[in-house]
């Protein structure tokens, strides 16, 4: 009877959870969702160059209280004071977690795009907004 509950609990607690679930579980989910929507959806673009995405995230970090979003066990982010360095670490972390891609273009310059997991999460969030109003 509680098999479905156990399956869901296991899914949410697993280190191998799908990227969409990792995104919802992240302490920094509001920041991630805000930033990804802003950079990839407000003006639809396929790819954003790595250096540009880092620069834009650093600008956002300068305007918010980012320390509220740092996970307790994230020593790298706790030790970095500069917003550009934090942005670089976050972009790489988001790529490692499957929220965005990190791949070279035809010239060998690295760029990012949304993964299908993040696309679906943003679509779902949009559907919630439409129902709220």
Name what the model sees in each region:
Residues 16-17, 40-41, 93:
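Preference for short coil/turn "hinge" residues that link or interrupt alpha-helices
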Residues 26-47:
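Positively charged, polyanion-binding regions of nucleic-acid-associated proteins
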Residues 25, 46-50, 80-84:
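Alpha-helix N-cap/helix-initiation sites
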Residues 1-31:
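Intrinsically disordered, low-complexity serine/threonine- and proline-rich regulatory segments
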Residues 11-15, 35-39, 129-133:
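Short, charged, low-complexity loops and linkers
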Residues 20-24, 45, 86, 113:
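Non-transmembrane, amphipathic alpha-helical segments
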Residues 55-59, 63-133:
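Extended assembly-interface/linker segments at domain junctions
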């Amino acid at each position: 009877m509680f098999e479905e509950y156990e399956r869901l609990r296991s899914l949410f607690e697993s280190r191998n959870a799908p990227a969409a679930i990792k995104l919802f579980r992240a302490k920094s989910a509001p920041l991630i969702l805000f930033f990804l929507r802003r950079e990839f959806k407000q003006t639809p673009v396929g790819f954003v160059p790595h250096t540009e995405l880092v620069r834009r995230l650093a600008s956002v970090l300068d305007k918010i209280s980012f320390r509220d979003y740092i996970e307790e066990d994230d020593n790298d982010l706790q030790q970095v004071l500069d917003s550009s360095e934090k942005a670089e670490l976050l972009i790489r972390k988001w790529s490692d977690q499957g929220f965005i891609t990190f791949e070279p273009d035809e010239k060998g310059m690295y760029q990012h795009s949304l993964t299908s997991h993040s696309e679906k999460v943003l679509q779902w969030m949009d559907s919630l907004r439409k129902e709220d109003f």
